[in-house]
């Protein structure tokens, strides 16, 4: 009976596989939105103000960071919790494959969230004249919460590894 439960629990990790595959669909949706934004900008590129172009570029950078975060969570999550990836020898292999445990994944996710939040905050500051002061304050507080959380997670991870 015990063996059955242990085997069933171990096999249940495969329930995560469709979730990680679903993240690849989210990446596809993000890619579509990325190119939709580019196709929207191209006809207006010469008429756009520099500040507006910078806002669009920050939005594209934001999407690229989110895409990288999705890939990192998909691949390393699959490797850590479901099964090791078997990449053919002749194919290009990401240098961090097999090296990122759940602790380092959490730190990378936290760092990515801080980077994404920084880009978002920069976009807000570019349009600060149209944003009420109390909203700006809350954006900064939320961003600092992300920064402090990422710092604390990294510090705790470093302390537990040594």
Curated annotation (Swiss-Prot):
Descriptive protein name: UPF0114 protein PSPA7_5214
Coiled coil: none
Membrane topology: Multi-pass membrane protein
HAMAP family found in the cross-reference section: UPF0114
InterPro entries: UPF0114, UPF0114_bac
Primary location class: membrane
Subcellular location: Cell membrane
């Amino acid at each position: 009976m015990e063996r059955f439960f242990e085997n069933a629990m171990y096999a249940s990790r495969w329930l995560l596989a469709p979730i990680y595959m679903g993240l690849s669909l989210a990446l596809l949706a993000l890619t579509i939105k990325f190119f939709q934004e580019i196709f929207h900008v191209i006809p207006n590129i010469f008429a756009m103000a520099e500040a507006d172009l910078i806002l669009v570029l920050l939005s594209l950078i934001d999407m690229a960071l989110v895409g990288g975060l999705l890939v990192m969570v998909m691949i390393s999550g699959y490797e850590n919790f479901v099964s090791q990836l078997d990449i053919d020898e002749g194919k290009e292999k990401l240098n961090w494959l097999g090296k990122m445990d759940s602790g380092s994944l959490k730190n990378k996710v936290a760092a990515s969230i801080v980077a994404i939040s920084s880009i978002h905050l920069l976009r807000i500051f570019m349009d600060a004249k149209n944003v009420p002061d109390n909203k700006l304050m809350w954006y900064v507080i939320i961003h600092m919460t992300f920064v402090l959380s990422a710092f604390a997670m990294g510090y705790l991870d470093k302390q537990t590894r040594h």
